[in-house]
Amino acid sequence: MFNGTREGALFALASVDMVDLHARPLPPQRPHSAGRALYRNNVGQKRPLRPKEVWAIRVRLQIKNRKRDLAMFNLAIDSKLRGCDLVSLRVDDIASGGHVRDRATIVQHNTGRPVQFEITEQTRASLQDWLNARPADRGPYVFPSRVHDQPHVTARQYARIVHGWIEGAGMDTSGYGTHSMRRTKAAQIYRKTGNLRAVQLLLRHTKIESTVRYLGIEVDDALRLSEQVEL
């Protein structure tokens, strides 16, 4: 069919490849949901808030007299809880006799293990203000939902609330999320002390490697800590 020239041989090979290409089934298309999940995975971890950003959000909530949001923000920073655990806190988890305690213990949804966290004076004050202003008939949860068929604020609603805090402070919303709240105090503790084991305990990680990844610790961080030690 083809002559014996070099051009004829190349044409023959190309023709075989084209036949094979048409006979070969096309790879299945990636569903849109998988694409979105892949995008989310490539975005990376959300950054912790810096102290000046914490104060910017806090002052804004105080000026606007947003008692619920101020209490939620302060407690999110102090407790270092995952969003699902934060929104499902009950009043009796954090208060006794109408007064907010300085420490609380709950059972985590994800792991089923108990966890203790501190409630600092500033957070206690904002929580006390919110509990005093919160309607008593709204159920047992610290942050009851405004939607009648939901007992408390959902994790999805919490994510939208956090987005509003970030946006209201004039920050880039793509860089922050609910995990920013969980990471903020832990990151500051690590930067000030270098005590990775303490941060691991506070975040309730079973493996130290998880804490390293969660904090995003890099070689530069290790070198910075090393430079602070003289022998």
Can you annotate each of these PLM segments?
Residues 2-3, 7-231:
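Conserved catalytic core of the tyrosine transesterase superfamily
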